[in-house]
């Protein structure tokens, strides 16, 4: 009994400094603070920790231009450049498919807007038919019904 108690008290004293030890300083709160500081330069009132002071504004900031001759790979951010789908596929069926439509980027002012934006993109009108109305769907439905009747 005493050995378990002493072990648990030692474990409680050894804590990761990055662990979630207070309500105001959880991992999620730290990540969200970093996000808002990077995006808008300040924190929303509901996310501010006790005693937080807003950063002093020294004037408008401008993006730093990097000269291509002295740019180091560590200074540049990686970006995703989609490949041309026609070069990826050698079949002729991809040429008849409509070109991919790129959705406009959405600027979110709050964390809730971020989720509302995702929901509105997913609720776009669909042109798909129910499974049973397509030829392959009706074939699947008939096979399913046929197998179900056997048992």
Curated annotation (Swiss-Prot):
GO annotation, biological process: vesicle docking involved in exocytosis
Pfam families membership: Mso1_C, Mso1_Sec1_bdg
Biased composition, class Polar residues, residue ranges: 55-77
Compositionally biased region (Low complexity): 85-105, 123-141
InterPro entries linked: Mso1_N_dom (IPR028095)
Region (Disordered): 48-151
Disulphide linkage map: none
Cellular component terms per the entry's GO annotation: cell division site; cell tip; cytosol; nucleus
Protein name: Uncharacterized protein C1F5.05c
């Amino acid at each position: 009994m005493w050995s378990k108690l002493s072990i648990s008290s030692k474990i409680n004293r050894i804590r990761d400094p990055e662990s979630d030890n207070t309500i105001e300083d959880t991992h999620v709160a730290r990540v969200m603070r970093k996000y808002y500081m990077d995006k808008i330069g300040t924190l929303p009132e509901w996310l501010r920790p006790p005693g937080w002071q807003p950063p002093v504004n020294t004037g408008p900031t401008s993006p730093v231009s990097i000269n291509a001759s002295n740019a180091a790979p560590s200074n540049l951010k990686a970006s995703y450049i989609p490949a041309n789908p026609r070069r990826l596929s050698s079949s002729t069926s991809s040429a008849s498919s409509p070109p991919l439509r790129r959705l406009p980027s959405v600027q979110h002012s709050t964390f809730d807007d971020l989720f509302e934006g995702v929901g509105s993109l997913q609720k776009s009108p669909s042109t798909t038919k129910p499974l049973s109305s397509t030829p392959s769907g009706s074939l699947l439905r008939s096979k399913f019904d046929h197998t179900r009747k056997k048992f």
